[in-house]
């Protein structure tokens, strides 16, 4: 199929490989009547296959619409689907848009009394089925809507539909990453080169909180084990090492003063030979040798 885009906006081989690897072309078994122009064929198992060429054309069209908005803060990106929470937050952080990740508060576009009231010039939603409340309120106040649409998505009140798989974490993250990159390229923020943007597509993928917590615990345990190993005493030295203690039968160093004389004010070390007979002084000058009995 011949692309209607200028050569500079045409998809590269790497972009097509990314779209196929993320399974952005895999649709559902159901197909809405208005989504039929974007369907390439239907597999034997009933799954509809989307046309990747039309996906890229609509992606570039949406990027050119977004880049035409002067104030980036007038763009609102919405995702009530959990797989799109991280993607819309990263998109908003890189392009300056407002992000609503999670439940959309009813009245955010129509009730000016609410704290979450917004007046965007354009909104981008991840799934028209899940984000139907935001699309309906946008239709009340004439806000254009760009949506990531699967084959079973209703296109009512949707102005620009990007045909893609909006059910998996990789396809959602990749489309938001490509959209953010194309917007920055059209604004002139980054060059149109393969290595012009240093943000990896992995940063837009959803991560399970339990997996993140488990990974953090493993990293903390590894750091604790490394710190404990560094604090261990060197080999050959331990608290049970008695090589530095005085040998049996020698004079206690605590009794010896600086001049080499015995210091009797120090604690008595006691006899060195515990197997010898005890000798005590019985009188003023006489010495008696104690015996083992009373006689």
Swiss-Prot record:
Molecular functions per Gene Ontology: structural constituent of ribosome
Subcellular location, record wording: Cytoplasm
Superkingdom, natural source: Eukaryota
Keyword NADP listed: no
Keyword Ribonucleoprotein: yes
Subunit structure: Component of the small ribosomal subunit. Mature ribosomes consist of a small (40S) and a large (60S) subunit. The 40S subunit contains about 33 different proteins and 1 molecule of RNA (18S). The 60S subunit contains about 49 different proteins and 3 molecules of RNA (25S, 5.8S and 5S). Interacts with RPS21.
Protein name: Small ribosomal subunit protein uS2
Originating species: Coprinopsis cinerea (strain Okayama-7 / 130 / ATCC MYA-4618 / FGSC 9003)
Gene responsible for this protein: RPS0
């Amino acid at each position: 199929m011949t692309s209607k885009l200028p050569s500079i906006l045409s998809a590269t081989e790497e972009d097509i490989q990314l779209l196929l690897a993320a399974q952005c072309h895999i649709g559902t078994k159901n197909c809405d009547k208005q989504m039929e122009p974007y369907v390439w064929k239907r597999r034997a198992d009933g799954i509809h296959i989307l046309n990747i060429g039309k996906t890229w054309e609509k992606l570039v069209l949406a990027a050119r619409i977004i880049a035409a908005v002067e104030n980036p803060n007038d763009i609102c990106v919405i995702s009530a689907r959990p797989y799109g929470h991280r993607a819309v937050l990263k998109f908003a952080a890189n392009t300056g848009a407002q992000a609503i990740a999670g439940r959309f508060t009813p009245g955010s576009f129509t009730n000016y009394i609410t704290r979450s009231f917004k007046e965007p010039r354009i909104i981008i939603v991840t799934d028209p089925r899940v984000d139907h409340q935001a699309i309906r309120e946008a239709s009340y106040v004439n806000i254009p809507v760009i949506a990531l649409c699967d084959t079973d998505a209703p296109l009512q009140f949707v102005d620009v539909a990007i045909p893609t798989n909006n059910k998996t974490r990789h396809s959602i993250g990749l489309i938001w990453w490509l959209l953010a990159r194309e917007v920055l390229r059209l604004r002139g923020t980054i060059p149109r080169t393969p290595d012009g943007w240093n943000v990896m597509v992995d940063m837009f993928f959803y991560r399970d909180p339990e997996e993140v917590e488990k990974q953090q615990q493993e990293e903390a345990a590894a750091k604790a084990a490394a710190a404990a190993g560094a604090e261990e005493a060197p080999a050959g030295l331990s608290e049970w090492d008695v090589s530095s203690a005085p040998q049996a039968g020698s004079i206690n160093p605590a009794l010896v003063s600086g001049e080499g004389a015995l210091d009797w004010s120090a604690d008595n070390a006691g006899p060195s030979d515990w197997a010898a007979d005890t000798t005590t002084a019985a009188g003023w000058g006489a010495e008696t040798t104690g015996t083992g009995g009373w006689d």
